Amino acid sequence: KGIELQIEIASARFQSLKDKRRNLLGRTGCGLCGAENLDQALRLPEKKIDITFSIKETAIIKALEALHTTQSLQKKTGATHACAWANEQGEIQLVREDVGRHNALDKLIGALQKKGFNGKGFVITTSRASYEMVQKTVMLGASTLIAISAPTGLAIRSALKYGLCLIGFARAPQYVIYTFTERVTKN
């Protein structure tokens, strides 16, 4: 799960530390602000995902090949992440960009919810796959997250726990399936 440290601090030093304590209440970001331990940070998603949904290898490759053409802000600035929703055929349906990978995913989730999300497809991110990205994808109700970069160990364990198919190092035509390999079918 992670490492949690318990440290004993002298009373006078503790009071000094307490006086300097910053406000942990966060209003934007990945959702970890205000969490003082790992259990608070690792909230279990309540949404159920379709563990029977599978995607074809050709759909993954098609979406990966098309992703860079949909990133208009990245083309102008070279400084943004993108998150995209691709349908079952691998056609990019929606893309959202932001300098923050979490913000890009939040924007995508909001746009999908407004449009009427049906769950038949997959999320692609141009970033690494952290457990927060896994958590948000599961909360959306999507059954697959594909990341251009590596997943973290906690992301892999969380994906296994939630039933999410997690794919990393995805650069067409190659990728690595970390969880639920049976959900990616050959053509």
Positions of the model-derived regions?
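Intrinsically disordered, low-complexity regions enriched in acidic/Ser/Thr/Pro/Gln residues
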Residues: 1-83, 88, 92-94
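Arginine residue identity/basic-tract feature
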Residues: 13, 21-22, 27, 43, ...
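Feature captures the catalytic cores and cofactor-binding loops of soluble hydro-lyases/lyases
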Residues: 101-180, 186
